[in-house]
From Swiss-Prot:
This is Heat shock protein beta-11. One of its GO terms (cellular component) is nucleus. Expressed specifically in the rostral-most somites at 24 hpf. At 48 hpf, expression continues in the rostral-most somites and also in the notochord. Somite expression was restricted to the vicinity of the horizontal myoseptum. In adults, expressed in the heart. Residues 184-205 are annotated as: Disordered. CDD domains: ACD_HspB9_like. It comes from Danio rerio (Zebrafish). It comes from the Eukaryota. PROSITE patterns: SHSP. Keywords: Stress response. The gene is hspb11. Gene3D superfamilies: 2.60.40.790. GO terms for biological process: myosin filament organization; protein refolding; response to heat. One of its GO terms (molecular function) is unfolded protein binding. Residues 67-180 form the sHSP domain.
Length: 205
């Protein structure tokens, strides 16, 4: 019977020293290798995040390209009339809501403004914003008190009214005449009988 040691090569201590030695279980890795793997994982996450942000920015830019804002500045029609003894100004504001209108009185001037914004969809995935804005200024007549101006909104018509007070400034005025009754002088009253007696005596002669 052959001995198993017969088939095993004879290894000297010097030959064992040159063979690589590693542990098969449990598996161990150098610390630098783990650090490198961690860095690679972080870099990959950063790359994914950058690609996501790039796609997000591109989507935002595409949405902006689909929106084409259009702003229109134009005055609105108005009618200035006189209703009896009132100053009346009517503006066509049917395209504006009450919250989109403003009326200010500065001295003897009226400043009327409005701004509206509406979204319009063309049915093809694109839409636009239609903006309309106006600013108009009016002078109040001299016979209108600025403090008495009032405005109202009725059926899309902005109505501004104020009572007329007439011509308050005039170069002509009536000056009343004041008088007191005349008082006779007492000395003159005492000399009247003497004068009458002298006149009577002269008539007899």
């Amino acid at each position: 019977m052959l001995c198993p040691s017969t088939f095993q090569p004879h290894l000297s201590p010097f030959m064992d020293f040159h063979w690589p030695v590693r542990s098969l279980w449990p598996e161990t890795r150098p610390l630098f290798f783990q650090f490198e793997q961690e860095m690679m994982r972080h870099m990959q996450e950063m790359r994914h995040n950058m690609e996501f942000m790039e796609r997000l920015h591109q989507r935002i830019f595409d949405e902006i390209d689909h929106v084409s804002p259009m702003t229109t500045f134009k005055p609105i029609s108005f009618q200035l009339g006189k209703e009896g003894s009132h100053y009346a100004l009517t503006l066509d504001t049917q395209d504006f809501s009450p919250e989109e209108l403003a009326v200010k009185q500065v001295g003897r001037k009226l400043r009327v403004s409005g701004k509206t914004e509406k979204k319009q969809d063309d049915g093809k995935g694109s839409y636009s914003y239609r903006c309309q804005e106006f600013r108009q200024e009016f002078d109040l007549p001299e016979d209108v008190n600025p403090e008495s101006v009032s405005c109202s909104l009725n059926n899309g018509q902005l109505q501004i009214q104020a009572p007329r007070e007439g011509n308050t400034v005039s170069n002509e005025r009536v000056i009343p005449i004041t008088y007191t009754p005349a008082v006779k002088n007492p000395a003159l009253q005492n000399s009247e009988p003497e004068n009458q007696a002298v006149e009577a005596e002269a008539a007899e002669n």
